[in-house]
Amino acid sequence: QEAESIIALTPRGAGLKATDFSASRDLAMSGQLSQYRVLHFATHGLLNSERPELSGLVFSLIDQEGKPQDGFLRLHEIYNLQLNADLVVLSACETGLGKEIKGEGLIGLVRGFMYAGAPRVVASLWSVDDLATAELMKLFYQRMLKDGLPAGAALRAAQLEMSGQKRWASPYFWAGFVLHGEWARSVTPK
């Protein structure tokens, strides 16, 4: 549902939608993602705050024929991606956390995607609610892609809009996502 509402906002033919079996670790590592300016991952995040190299994203664990496959994209693999994305959105639980290393800062998924080439990453600070996250992301992309707001302003506008709705008024539903990196420039999807 989240992916469908976002892809509907992009220009026809401007995106790659990989869901279910097609959302694979192999696709993420294939280099194909380097063609796109915005990457949105709506999946499960794995956080290992003691051994951050074991953190990652979970893609399909079975292929179209029902055979098991490695669906775990680990942090060291993320560091080695070569991305041209203006923005990476990690729409999963605790994707903005990591391990604090003295003299280095926070080691986690955000740093991995920035090291891979993304100047800005939207990530979560806690275990987020699925329905609220889908609504927040829909509003975020509407503000960014339709209204032309920079990513930081679009996220703020989406969060303010949700905070004004009775159902989503609690900050638990909308405040968990933050933008890391360069916040002022607009993002152009491909």
Where are the predicted features?
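Catalytic cores of enzymes
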Residues: 1-190
